[in-house]
Amino acid sequence: AIRKAKDLGFRVNVACTLFDQLDADEAAEFFNFCTNDLQVEGVTISPGYAYERAPDQKHFLSRRKTKQLFRDIFAKPDAKTWRFSQSTLFLDFLAGNQSYKCTPWGNPARNVFGWQRPCYLLGEGYADSFKSLMEETNWDDYGTGNYEKCADCMVHCGYEATAVSDTVAHPLKALDVF
């Protein structure tokens, strides 16, 4: 399907979630396949984190394991050739080299029920409007260190926005990474 879409002139990006049983060699093989064989425009990656509604709780990554896995992945010889769809500082955060707080409102999710609170993974209710989501959600209650359900989270929906803000504020810092 990806090759067909590319043949038809579509830009293709793939999203993948990495879980506990994956090792850096397998991840590198997948990224090489996406970049070299499929020639996708980019890969969006995120660590699998044990949010409570997930049906399989035993294959998720802890923060410690996430950092080690991404350090090992980015140490691979081909790492600089892979096309990721995320900021370099977010990728550096995944490897444990940046300390960020979650920005749960940075990637709001909406479905037929409304705007999800506080993020699509926790889904602790819905707001009827974006204004209601922003003004009636107590954002300080969420994020790693503030809420036990967020303890191991390093997911893009909360941390990419923080990394992008850091990139805008410190562009030279972002250029130093990778």
For the regions a language model picked out, list residue spans one by one.
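Radical SAM enzyme [4Fe-4S]-AdoMet core and its adjacent flexible, acidic
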Residues: 1-107, 112, 117, 121, ...
